Structures are given as structure tokens and as C-alpha cells.
Amino acid sequence: MVLTRRAREVALTQHIGVSAETDRAVVPKLRQAYDSLVCGRRRLGAIGAEIENAVAHQRALGLDTPAGARNFSRFLATKAHDITRVLAATAAESQAGAARLRSLASSYQAVGFGPKPQEPPPDPVPFPPYQPKVWAACRARGQDPDKVVRTFHHAPMSARFRSLPAGDSVLYCGNDKYGLLHIQAKHGRQWHDIADARWPSAGNWRYLADYAIGATLAYPERVEYNQDNDTFAVYRRMSLPDGRYVFTTRVIISARDGKIITAFPQTT
């Protein structure tokens, strides 16, 4: 027991050390990219000020004379060349910065931010055919809210300023506010009606929900972020084998750990 605990402590220390080292490497690279962008903006601003100053003193330029018009045309051509040169340099530095940041991706994957799901996603095909997994049973009164009912794989989620790396989304028994008991009480009839009308041979409505939740989390078509409760709303359209649209699955998960809050079908 002592050895196991000590081994875990060593692993955690190494994990944190790698993460901190990677974070320290990211900061100067981000700063360099920011400084390059600011420098480019300043240079463009200076060029713009020169053009505005020239336009403000048109009389001194003698634009009504052939020589004045020719000189002003050369001036504008030079400034256009300067603008193109600044944009090219800024773009090149931006691409170089992106390459430097990509070089750190393997370090972040080593500390848990890479796509390393434990639960494989379902095939992105219409239901059926599909072999659902068995959901664990929950006591009706919510005596076991932390019991795991089913684990789904979720793709990387990103919306607005919030993101969640790929991993597992757990459906717990929960209570009246989240998990299977919430889905069963609030949305069980919706799942049942669609399953009974469209896939009567599929059996329990949970079979349809199992596929729909799994496919939506693994292959999301739209993701929205709710800052008020720190959740992602994940959407995917569901169709019959012949391609006819039936409903859209909406799955709400925690943006912190991917826990499934609720899931239900939308037909409008």
C-alpha cells in the first residue's frame, strides 16, 4: 500500500513537472507572437499617417501639375509596397510562431491534453444498425447519484473562450437535476415516442438514446458554450438509414470534466 501510494506521488510529481515546463515554454512564444503583431500594427499605422499627411497638404504637392501628379503617384506606389512588405513579414512571423507552438503539442499530450479516449466512439452511421451497451441500473429515489451508468467518448469541444480536450463523458445515475434519473424523468417520454414511432424494432428507448448520445459527443455538428453554468450544448442531426432527417440530439455536458448533465431529442 505504501509503495503504491508513493508511486502515485512520484507519477503526479512528474506529471506536474512536465506540465509546468511546457507552460513556461509557451509564455515566451506567445509573447513573441504578440510583440510581432503589435510591431506590424505600429508600422502600418505610421504608413497610414504619412498618407493622411500627404493628402492633407494637397496644395503643396501640386497635384494639378503633371510633375506633382506623377510624384504623388510614385509616393502612393511606394507606400503600397511598404504595406505589402509589412503584411508579408507579419504573416511569416505568425506562421513561424504557430509552428513553434505546434512543436509543444506532444508535451501537452504527454500530460493529458491529447486525444487519448478510453471509450471508443460509435461509427457515424444512422441508427440502426447499432449494438447498444448495457446501462447500469439506478435506484429510483437517487440513493446512488455517483454510480456510473455509461461512459461515452467525446471529441474535443471548443466554443467562445472555453475548450475541453477529447476524453470521456460519464453518465451518472444523478438525481432530478442531472444524469440518468433526470433524463428519464424529464425527457424519457420524448425518447420513447421517437423510438416507438421511427424504430419500433429497436426495443427500449435507451438503445436509441445510447447511440444518439454517443454519436453526438463523438461527432458533434455544433457546440455552444453557456457561461452561466459552465456547460457545453452539443448537437447532431439524426437520420434514418435512407437519409431522411428525424431529429436533432442535444447533449449538455460540463465544460470542466465532460460529465453528462442531460440529453434529449429535438424535432423542431
From Swiss-Prot:
One Pfam annotation reads DUF4226
InterPro entries in UniProt: DUF4226
Q: What does the entry list under GO cellular component?
A: plasma membrane
Stated family: To M.tuberculosis Rv0025 and Rv0026.
Q: What is this protein called?
A: Uncharacterized protein Rv0739
Classification of source organism: Bacteria, Bacillati, Actinomycetota, Actinomycetes, Mycobacteriales
